[in-house]
């Protein structure tokens, strides 16, 4: 299973030097998972970077189409409690901790795709196989 955080998922929809790595990792995995927060984060980032309304609508449509294939992990009380623990233990932001807490709920083994370097030590310590530009 491939758990994807928003830093990586966003690269699926924008031109970026990390896009080929993200696309390859997603193509190799038959099962994708992400926190419910990831979809909103990505769609808002695409809205903010869109050069036109048509561009934004096309990007949002692509996210909605792909999201049908994503196993969405809810950001509920259990997830938030675990995120608090992770954030406190590793000194990362709540948003970063939410992505890790969501991935931590998945059955192992989990490959964790992120471009956020702050998450890497925590993800490794949580037992995830890392998929990053540096891994």
Descriptions of predicted regions:
Residues 1, 39, 100-135:
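Acidic, PIN/NYN-like endoribonuclease modules and their adjacent C-terminal/linker elements
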Residues 1-37, 49-61, 128:
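Short, well-structured N-terminal submotif of metal-dependent ribonuclease cores
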Residues 4, 33-34, 74, 94-97, ...:
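Short beta-strand scaffold positions
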Residues 29-32, 68-71, 107-111:
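Short active-site oxyanion
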Residues 61-90, 97-101:
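Acidic catalytic patch
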């Amino acid at each position: 299973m491939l758990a994807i955080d928003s830093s990586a998922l966003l690269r699926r929809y924008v031109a970026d030097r990390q896009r080929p790595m993200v696309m390859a990792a997603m193509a190799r995995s038959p099962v994708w998972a992400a926190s419910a927060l990831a979809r909103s984060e990505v769609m808002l980032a695409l809205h903010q970077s869109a050069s036109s309304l048509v561009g934004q609508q096309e990007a949002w449509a692509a996210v909605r189409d792909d999201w049908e294939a994503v196993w969405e992990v809810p950001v509920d009380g259990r997830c938030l409690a675990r995120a608090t623990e992770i954030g406190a233990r590793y000194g990362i932001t709540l948003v970063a901790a939410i992505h890790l807490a969501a991935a931590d709920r998945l059955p192992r083994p989990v490959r964790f795709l992120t471009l956020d370097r702050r998450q890497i030590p925590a993800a490794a310590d949580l037992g995830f196989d890392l998929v990053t530009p540096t891994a």
